Amino acid sequence: MHAFRGAITMNLVLIALQLIVALGILNVWILRPGKATPYRGGAAKNLREEFAAYGLPFWFMCVVGVLKVGLALALVAAVWIHSVAQPAAVGLGLLMLGAVVMHVKVKDPITKALPAVSVLTMCAAIALL
């Protein structure tokens, strides 16, 4: 009985992590791409300026956006289709690792990279659970 309860708890933790990551990514890329936040790289006030601050072209921002939104939606789908969770988490984790590297590249204070580090950590947990 205890093992069963533990499995249910772990499954709920996994679902919570998937939804936290997915909704956070969708918030940034769909609801707030043009809004300033304290976490944008460099002195950027929106996503386009942030990618420019990293020295990355607009087309690259579009590719990253499509990948992040697609992988976030895959994490939502993984609530029902469990086999999708690990590849989606690994893909998003790699993109978040890239985000951390870009923050380091432009010498941002660590506080600006904290959301990317947090999402990277949650993606690692999803991939390993």
Whereabouts are the PLM-identified features?
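Membrane-interface extramembranous regions
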Residues: H2-L129
